[in-house]
Structure formats: structure tokens, C-alpha cells
Amino acid sequence: MCLGIPGQIVAITDAGRMMALADVSGVKRAVNVACVAEGPLEDLLGHWALIHVGFAMSLIDEAEAARTLEALRDLGEAQETLAQMAEGAAALEGRG
């Protein structure tokens, strides 16, 4: 399964290699923008993209980015809850 994480393109770092800097939930990541570049790379500044393994795979709007980030946060919270439930069950069974 391929999971893209929303990131906002904040800088072009190497136009020749089609590299940019994206802000992914407050963390700056180097990303290749070759898959989403349709004109001057500077046109990508401020845009949101789904990023997977260092590549901007598709452009999305800010609302979709917010919805995706919220869903990912919810998924993380669900995983934490399931892990806590498993730990509790193990403790009750004398395994923890």
C-alpha cells in the first residue's frame, strides 16, 4: 500500500534536479517535484502535494490536505488505543 502524506512546498532547492523543500507537519523534507511540475518550479511554491518516499506524487488543495492530515492523526490515535487495549488484555492475562 502506498501512503502519501500532505506537505506544502516552501522552497525550490535545486531546480536542475527538480528538488524542493516541503513542510510536512512542521518537519522540512527534501522532495523531488518532477511528477507534479508542469511549468516553472517557482509556480509550485505554496502548493500542497501528497508526498511518498521523497517524491511529490500529486498536487492537492489545502482543504484536502487538512482532511488527510486529520484522518492520519485519527488513525494514529486509533492505533494507540488498540495498542493500549492489547497491553491491558495482556496484563489481565498475566502476560504483561
UniProtKB/Swiss-Prot annotation:
Matches recorded under SUPFAM superfamilies: HupF/HypC-like (SSF159127)
A Pfam family hit: HupF_HypC
GO molecular function, one term: carbon dioxide binding
Pathway involvement of the protein, from the record: Protein modification; [NiFe] hydrogenase maturation
InterPro entries: Hydgase_assmbl_chp_CS, Hydrogenase_HupF/HypC
Origin superkingdom: Bacteria
A GO biological-process term: protein maturation
Cited function: Involved in the maturation of [NiFe] hydrogenases. Involved in the biosynthesis of the Fe(CN)(2)CO cofactor.
Family to which the UniProt record says this protein belongs: Belongs to the HupF/HypC family.
Protein name: Hydrogenase maturation factor HypC
Species of provenance: Rhodobacter capsulatus
